[in-house]
Each structure stands twice: as structure tokens, then as C-alpha cells.
């Protein structure tokens, strides 16, 4: 009977496998790694999408020593020019005045050519002028004078100017011709004084030199004829 109980006990004993043995303790960690990697990728993309700041140019400080040196140089040049003008004789002052006037005329001519779109080397430049007003005729005359003055070194230039003036005056009335004659005579007188002064040897100030009247600024009337008339123009009429 005891054997029957033992056999019965043995038959009822059922060995169940441990359910926990089949559970993967690393399960789910791969998913965590995938999520982590996706976060890192998103962070990298955000960093790449951030706009980079443009390089700000570095402002260079001006060289104070160089600036001061240039200002001092300009001041010395102005003083030197002022001293030079102060030591000029009346004849030299007149020559300087005419020189500056010529520079101003050339500058005015350049502005006039630019205003009319005319170039000094362009073909048919003077044909582009069609003056109507007084100012336009002045600009046209300045342009003609500039063009003609390019040939002043030619030995035929004096005769050419004489013929040109005579031909132009044919179209004027006697009253207007008289005005032209007065202007030419004034120019002749000034030129004669300058040439005589240049022919003299340098001497002490105020010795043997007549003082010229330089307050006569009425030279606009002969601007269009240039500054190179010969001394015998008082007889051309």
C-alpha cells in the first residue's frame, strides 16, 4: 500500500518550466538605442539648419600720425603758395591772374562739353552744338576757341586767326565791330605790358617798373578769341 502512495505521488508531480527563463532581459534596449539615435540625428539637423553669422568687417582705426602729417603738409603748401603770391610783382600778378583764368575757362569748357555730350576726340563734336540762348553761345564759343587753340604753335596760326576774325566781323554791324575792336585793343595792351615786363631783367622791387592797373577785369568779351593774339592786332581793322 505504501508503494501505491509513492507511485501516485510520483505520477502527480508535474515539473513546470520557469517562465522567467525564456524572458530576454535585454528586450527593449534596442528600441531605446534607436530612439536615442533618432534624437541625435534631429539635433544634428537643427545645428546644420542654424544660419551662420556673417563675418563682420573689422573697422580699422585711422592712423592719426599719418593724418596729422598730411594736414601739416597741406598747411605748409598753402603758406608757401601765399608767400609766393605776396612776393609777385604787378606784372607777375597779372600773368598769374590770366593763367588762373585760362584754367577756369578750360574747366568751364569741359563742363560744357560734358553737358552737351561732346567729346574732344569724337568725330563731328562741334556739330552737336545748336546754340540758341546767350549761355549756349558762350559755351559754343568756348568749345570753338579750345578747338582752334590746339594749333597755336603753327606758324600759320596768327594769319589764320586774323582771317577768321575778319570773316566773322563781316556779319556784324559797325557798332558791334567797334565793340570787338575795343576788346581786342584791350587785350593787345595787356599782352604788350606782359611781354615788356618779361623782357626786362629781374631788378629790385619798385625800381624802373611801372605799376600796371590790374583792377580791370573786363576780359570776358574776348574769351571766345583765346589768349594768343599777336601784338599787331590793333591794325587788323
Curated annotation (Swiss-Prot):
Domain of life: Eukaryota
GO biological process, one term: regulation of translational initiation
Keywords, alphabetical: Coiled coil, Cytoplasm, Initiation factor, Protein biosynthesis
Compartments where located: Cytoplasm
Xref: Gene3D superfamilies: Eukaryotic translation initiation factor 3 like domains
Compositionally biased region (Acidic residues): 28-46
GO MF term (any one): translation initiation factor activity
Cysteine disulfide partners in this protein: none
Main localization category: cytoplasm
Pfam families reported for this sequence: eIF3_subunit (PF08597)
Coiled coil: 63-112
Cellular component GO terms held in the UniProt record: eukaryotic 43S preinitiation complex; eukaryotic 48S preinitiation complex; eukaryotic translation initiation factor 3 complex
Region annotation (Disordered) ranges: 1-66
Ranges of biased composition (kind: Basic and acidic residues): 47-58
InterPro entries in the cross-refs: eIF3-like_dom_sf, eIF3j
Assembly, per entry: Component of the eukaryotic translation initiation factor 3 (eIF-3) complex. The eIF-3 complex interacts with pix.
Function: Component of the eukaryotic translation initiation factor 3 (eIF-3) complex, which is involved in protein synthesis of a specialized repertoire of mRNAs and, together with other initiation factors, stimulates binding of mRNA and methionyl-tRNAi to the 40S ribosome. The eIF-3 complex specifically targets and initiates translation of a subset of mRNAs involved in cell proliferation.
Similarity-based family: Belongs to the eIF-3 subunit J family.
The protein, known as: Eukaryotic translation initiation factor 3 subunit J
Organism: Drosophila ananassae (Fruit fly)
Amino acid at each position: 500500500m505504501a508503494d501505491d502512495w509513492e507511485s501516485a505521488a510520483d505520477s502527480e508531480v508535474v515539473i513546470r518550466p520557469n517562465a522567467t527563463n525564456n524572458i530576454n532581459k535585454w528586450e527593449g534596449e534596442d528600441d531605446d538605442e534607436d530612439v536615442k539615435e533618432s534624437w541625435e540625428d534631429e539635433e544634428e539637423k537643427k545645428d546644420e539648419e542654424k544660419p551662420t553669422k556673417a563675418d563682420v568687417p573689422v573697422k580699422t582705426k585711422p592712423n592719426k600720425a599719418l593724418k596729422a602729417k598730411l594736414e601739416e603738409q597741406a598747411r605748409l603748401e598753402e603758406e608757401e603758395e601765399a608767400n609766393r603770391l605776396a612776393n609777385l610783382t604787378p606784372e607777375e600778378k597779372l600773368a598769374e591772374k590770366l593763367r588762373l583764368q585760362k584754367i577756369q575757362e578750360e574747366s568751364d569748357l569741359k563742363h560744357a562739353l560734358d553737358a552737351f555730350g561732346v567729346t574732344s576726340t569724337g568725330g563731328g563734336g562741334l556739330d552737336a552744338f545748336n546754340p540758341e540762348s546767350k549761355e549756349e553761345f558762350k559755351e559754343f564759343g568756348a568749345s570753338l576757341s579750345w578747338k582752334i587753340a590746339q594749333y597755336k604753335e603753327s606758324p600759320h596760326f596768327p594769319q589764320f586767326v586774323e582771317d577768321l576774325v575778319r570773316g566773322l566781323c563781316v556779319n556784324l554791324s559797325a557798332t558791334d565791330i567797334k565793340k570787338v575792336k575795343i576788346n581786342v585793343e584791350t587785350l593787345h595792351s595787356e599782352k604788350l605790358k606782359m611781354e615788356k615786363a618779361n623782357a626786362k631783367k629781374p631788378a629790385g622791387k619798385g625800381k624802373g617798373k611801372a605799376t600796371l592797373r590790374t583792377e580791370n577785369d573786363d576780359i570776358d568779351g574776348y574769351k571766345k578769341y583765346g589768349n594768343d593774339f599777336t601784338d599787331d592786332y590793333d591794325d587788323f581793322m
